[in-house]
Amino acid sequence: MNLNKNNFLNYSILIPYLILAGIGIVMIFSTTVPDQLQKGLNPYKLVINQTAFVLLSIIMIAVIYRLKLRALKNRKMIGIIMVILILSLIFCRIMPSSFALTAPVNGARGWIHIPGIGTVQPAEFAKVFIIWYLASVFSTKQEEIEKNDINEIFKGKTLTQKLFGGWRLPVVAILLVDLIMPDLGNTMIIGAVALIMI
């Protein structure tokens, strides 16, 4: 029997998101237009950028919502995205300060500057990835976790294996790479997200 996924759409999440996104665009318009005019720049540039990102996010929501659960649990895809994420974080850290694409912002090295668009912070994607990754891990261990409780989550012969082995290694790697940016704020948020998921 084919189920209509529209029946499972959670409007209590979607509608507040759309309302907040709309309010955000209006607020950016009201606060940036006078400043942009004063500087002699395009008054609608920042509003257009924000609107473009909101539309992009809606498209991404639609695409992800239409994905089959099997695709979201695909270990190969998760692994590829994890490697890209960690490499982008390392790229931000090791490139010299004079390199325009990764110039520091407020002393931290976690941003990639994209000409004509703005900045992208890989750590922001790391928060979403951690939720996705841990949800995938725990969904495959559900029966074992119900049976063995916390012992299944921190499985290992030694303390090192219990803390850093198996599925925990990618989480620790992302936390450490983000910490050396230095970006303590995002590191704490990612760590908190991981703990909540556990």
Swiss-Prot record:
Reactions listed under catalytic activity: [GlcNAc-(1->4)-Mur2Ac(oyl-L-Ala-gamma-D-Glu-L-Lys-D-Ala-D-Ala)](n)-di-trans,octa-cis-undecaprenyl diphosphate + beta-D-GlcNAc-(1->4)-Mur2Ac(oyl-L-Ala-gamma-D-Glu-L-Lys-D-Ala-D-Ala)-di-trans,octa-cis-undecaprenyl diphosphate = [GlcNAc-(1->4)-Mur2Ac(oyl-L-Ala-gamma-D-Glu-L-Lys-D-Ala-D-Ala)](n+1)-di-trans,octa-cis-undecaprenyl diphosphate + di-trans,octa-cis-undecaprenyl diphosphate + H(+)
Gene Ontology BP term (one): peptidoglycan biosynthetic process
UniProt subcellular location: Cell membrane
InterPro entries: FtsW/RodA
Pfam annotation, one family: FTSW_RODA_SPOVE
GO cellular component terms, A-Z: cell division site; plasma membrane
Bilayer topology term: Multi-pass membrane protein
Domain of life of the native organism: Bacteria
Swiss-Prot/TrEMBL keywords: Cell cycle, Cell division, Cell membrane, Cell shape, Cell wall biogenesis/degradation, Glycosyltransferase, Membrane, Peptidoglycan synthesis, Transferase, Transmembrane, Transmembrane helix
Segments crossing the lipid bilayer: 13-33, 44-64, 77-97, 171-191
Pathway: Cell wall biogenesis; peptidoglycan biosynthesis
EC number: 2.4.99.28
An MF annotation (GO) of this entry: lipid-linked peptidoglycan transporter activity
PANTHER family cross-referenced by the UniProt entry: CELL CYCLE PROTEIN, PEPTIDOGLYCAN GLYCOSYLTRANSFERASE FTSW-RELATED
Free-text function comment from the UniProt entry: Peptidoglycan polymerase that is essential for cell division.
Family: Belongs to the SEDS family. FtsW subfamily.
Protein name: Probable peptidoglycan glycosyltransferase FtsW
